[in-house]
């Protein structure tokens, strides 16, 4: 039985004498995910494997390989963040030709549904639907369906104008009227668009602008149904020029009684990735198992969520210290599609994002991912184009990463060198307390000058009452320069360092 004091990995600990201990696992394949039971009397952990619907832990035939159990122990928190232990315990890349795998910076039809402005569903006419029997053609549109032709074109135009690679579109396919909470097996077919989403015309329009659409496959956790349609769904993507899919596993797993972390599901997640590779499709899996470094073996697994991402800011808010914890926990196993970039902190549903704009900018550096979203509405960025410039400039693939300072839940400052470039980017996030960072630029190439554009919280900034207060300064710097930067609680700073 999983204990009331049990915990999930990756677990970050700190002893009274300042030793940092990180516990996780690596190379989780054909095996149930591990949790840790805690005996709070003896303070000892015991491995607890996620059972299947029958209560069995797993089925293996010898010889077999179990996942690695990992421990990172250090007196310097930065070394936890820079460790490649988990990644290196995975097998080398198994995909022979990786030329089709690439980093992606994207916008999307997503935040407006999450924050209460729009909806995934097309109509309110039907409280329940059947994929092969509901007449959507004659249904009355609700007027709130976000994935419509005009709105998607608006996002495509915005992406093209500002140099983004792609546009994610959620809610394009039939079935969203009763997708959640009913444990329907045949909930989506991943093939049939709503009447107001012209899949052919929209992809042609996007491609004419130098932009691609990102497919969305919400499974509602009906994984057997997804596997039934998977090949046809991937082929549809190739037919229309998609090369990336965001998959989702919201809700209780079907087959009923299975768990997101049981052996059956672990095998399904990897099957979806390996089958996608056959079609040259990159996968960004949300609500799946927390990563264990498999992106080394299967680099088309370009992103994962598997933790409280930005969407929870629209579900009542997340404490500011959260983004100073995730790199020590969730990101130990691989990159996270955190979906940062919120500029308007007050959501249409009454929730508030507990961050400043500069705190959001910093996440593009501190939260590693080769898949980065600018999640807010185009109109919210257009009000702050000077701050938005950092999102346009920041790289998503790196040659080198350095952690300048770090303390779990309090602050993290990272510097990364853009891949194939002399440019660097720095990001710093804070938790529940204000923090002053002393940033030594000695990682820059000696003898070279850089134009530093510094985005930092204004003195009056407050993540609750004044989150849009920021100051932008420019100066010429070298490897001898030292910057002192003040961040408010829930805030941060971002710096672009462009080589001259």
Regions found by a protein language model. Give the residues of each.
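Conserved, mostly hydrophobic/aromatic
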Residues: 159, 283, 366, 426
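Aromatic- and carboxylate-enriched substrate-binding clefts and catalytic-loop regions
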Residues: 171-356
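Catalytic cores of secreted or luminal carbohydrate-active enzymes
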Residues: 358-405, 494
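Carbohydrate-binding surface patches
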Residues: 408-451, 493-494
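C-terminal beta-strand-rich structural cap/linker in extracellular carbohydrate-active enzymes
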Residues: 474-500
